[in-house]
Amino acid sequence: MGKLGKKARKFAKKNLQSVEKRSRKLKPFIKKKFAKRNERHQAGDKQEKKVEQQPKKRCQEEEFQDIAIDAVFGKDDDEVLRDGDSDSDGYLDELVNETDSDIMKCKVLSRSFLATCCDMVDKEQYVPALVRLLNWYRAACQYGHEPSGIARPNIYYDIEDSETFAKVIIFVLQKADHTFRSILGLSDSSTKEKILKLKNNPKWDSLKPLVKSFFRSTLHLVKQAGDLEIISFTLTQLRVSIVFLAAFPDLLKKLIKISVHLWVTGEETISQQAFLILKDISMVFNSECFDSCLINMYKAFLHDCDIPKANSEQRPFLRDSLVELCSQDVQKSYTKASVSITQLAKLLKMALATKNKEAVEKIHSGEYINCVDLWVNFISANVQDCDLQPLLYTIVQVINGVAQLIIGPRYLLLRVKCIHWLNHLSRTSGIFIPIASLVLDMLEYKTTNDGEKQEQKLEAVSTVKLPKNWLKSQNFQEQCIFSVIELLAVHFAQWSFHISFPDLATIPVMRLKKFHERSTMEGLKRVVKRFIEQVESNIEFVQRKRDDVTFSPNDQQSADTFMQLEKQNANAPYTQYYQSIIDKALGTNKKKKK
């Protein structure tokens, strides 16, 4: 068939539907087929980017679930190496330096034989007698935790009675350190460097297994003993010999792990003794063990804070002792604190952005709140002696964010705690931190007085979120206003003699006057009125002094020395008023504890 003419093609294009349909199908195919290769690649890349960008928000939400406050320092350092730390070594070989042929076959410790061995060790540092004592000491420490009978081939270790049992433990704990040092010729002030140099001492080769046996048995006793007095006595005696652990790094790690556990979970005396051991370890071994002690204590502290307890009076001690350890090496602790506070800020930022229920609960958890409390106290303890301004700025931003995350009367306690933190940081650093707006917002809480009167004080409530029945109680607003007065009194007391005090106190006084006018509770009105009168009196006092000055407002040095003499006067009216409020608060706390 020949080619159609021009007129025929024109007719077909206009009138035949099949031709139009086919051309429409082929047109995009032809364009795609002959498109430039680079353009096709670019189009593909754009599509891939769109696919990748879609779940971005979802990834952020999932990322929040993976953030843990106690995971910022990496893995635990509390795993103990098993080589040389297991109990498979058994008892010491009693043939060391022994030429006697009549070695006891039955190893039963009697009172008379114990007295003989103790006398030989105490006066002569006789090594074979020390070996026997350490074997019986090990048997006593392992009592009830290993099968009775033959512990080694053809050798049986046993103790005659309970009195002998107690004496062998007490004697070894009291005399072992002195005996080791006497044999090696070491003084009581020997450092870990001297212990490490003992490798070249021939006496050390024969004494090292004895020292190791003593520590292994003692650590087992501390870990397994159920009597608090035995544990306390053992920890006290163990502190003297810590320097010897330089030769046994595995046992040193095990001691850190056991001490951290006792520090967190032990009774008050045990907890204090365990902390002293951790403190001594970090001082004796410096950088080698400071990080390990700090990280393990930090994680144990946060884990304990996340567990609800009926009695949480020990937590201030745990916090203060951890702050004390951090203060031993502020430079290293600064790095850890910076990482931890940054993590707190990330969690808060996510919670503020999403207002997700789980995110808010994370911020209000005991772990988060106590972590903030820890670093607030660390900064306050060291801000005068060290440059901690970056940490101070960041933690203040975090505290302000926590206070404003959810505003409402049920979160009154959390807001009060946040303001206490800010007042504490301001007082210790000498830097002005505004808190008036956070305090005065508490005046606007709408409450009713329909419920029963609560006998419990606000400070005694352990939860962050108040129960609903508290909001309807008769004295909730009363306790709320008392908190406002106390917080403002502390804030004003710091700046009561500053040249800018009239400007600082004017707006809070105006807000308090409005509250005084609309309040119908006479008891509250009297308290608020007295506070207003005291503040206004101090405003007038500072204003009169300020009117007499001759220096410029730009003269910062003169402004800082303003009213320094008056500041030292404890009889100033506002100072006395502030002291009465503090005394009243302290008296309330004492009654609560009783």
From Swiss-Prot:
Matching InterPro entries: Noc2
Pfam families xref list: Noc2 (PF03715)
Tissues showing expression: Expressed at low levels in roots, shoots, leaves, stems, inflorescences, flowers and siliques, with highest levels dividing tissues.
Residue window of motif Nuclear localization signal 3: 512-519
Biased amino acid composition, Basic residues: 1-13
Region (Disordered): 1-21, 35-58
Traits of the deletion mutant: Plants lacking both CRC and RBL exhibit strong floral meristem (FM) indeterminacy with reiterations of extra floral whorls in the center of the flower associated with reduced AGAMOUS and SUPERMAN levels.
Swiss-Prot/TrEMBL keywords: Nucleus
Biased composition, class Basic and acidic residues, residue ranges: 36-58
UniProt GO cellular component terms: nucleolus; nucleoplasm; nucleus
Function: Collaboratively with CYP40/SQN and ULT1, influences floral meristem (FM) determinacy in an AGAMOUS and SUPERMAN-dependent manner, thus contributing to the floral developmental homeostasis.
Protein's name in the database: Protein REBELOTE
Organism from which the protein derives: Arabidopsis thaliana
